[in-house]
Amino acid sequence: MKAILNILLTGIIQLGVTHFVYAQSTLDNIHSTGIFRIGTEGAYAPFSYHDASGKLTGFDVEIGREIAQRMKAKPEFIEGKWDGLIGGLDAGRFDAVMNQIAITPEREKKYSFSLPYVISEAVLITQKDNNDIKTFSDLKGKKSAHTLTNNFAQIARHYGADIIGTNGFNQEVDLVSTGRADATINDKLSYLDYKKHRPDAPVKIVAADTRAAQTAVLLRKNDTELKTAVDKAITEIKADGTYQRIWDKYFAENN
């Protein structure tokens, strides 16, 4: 009986130690492996996408590389669809997610965020000839194109829109431009980049949410040491001019 009790106690202690290591040592794992695993979409220009040569690039990707460098690690970008990125963080496939993840009260209940590295606003996009939708309130009963779990879809639902599920921004705007969706709500910077590359696309902005959305690195709630390290890196990037250089590369024409 005593032997059985000792075995049980040993198992409980080992389980507790394993859980403690998993919950507390993400930064230690990054330091020991030299790899910072970042989940990203790879299909959301200009933040995370593939250039003409097939190389993964974008504003978020370049900021992620700089963060990793300042943590003395190599970034490993693991691509996936938007709807699976947060689940991938939960499952431990990534150490962080960088894909224009907006800070929201709902997400803050379960996750941790770094200091914000982008501040933008949500815009309502319709087909160029659409005169029925002029404000967010006009979305009631209309079809709005979104990835199902992002914060823009939540805004559209709030105004009574029927959601058409998509795989990302380009599909959303294409659905609007071809009339298969009435509208989409999305990030202003993404829209401006889209129009820069496709100036003849028959879409327009009809309204903007002036409450700026803050974008940050998404982390697990218990990764406090990693958050401190990422925040330190972001602060350094902004202080030494690196952030402004990357910003100007992607958004100078939009200023």
PLM regions with names:
Residues 24, 73-84, 100-105, 109, ...:
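A conserved helix-loop-strand patch within extracytoplasmic ligand-binding domains
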Residues 25-100:
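Extracytoplasmic small-molecule ligand-binding "clamshell" domains
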Residues 27, 59-60, 107-118, 203-208, ...:
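A structural signal for short loop-to-beta-strand junctions that line the ligand-binding cleft
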Residues 48-52, 64-73, 136, 140, ...:
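Ligand-binding cleft/hinge of the Venus flytrap
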Residues 62-70, 130, 137, 143, ...:
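Extended ligand-binding regions for polar small-molecule ligands
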Residues 77-87, 131, 148-150, 164-178, ...:
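Short helix-initiation/N-cap motifs at beta->coil->alpha
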Residues 87, 101-109, 155-158, 182-211:
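A ligand-binding cleft/hinge motif common to bilobed small-molecule-binding domains
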Residues 119-126, 188, 192-235, 251-255:
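Periplasmic-binding protein-like
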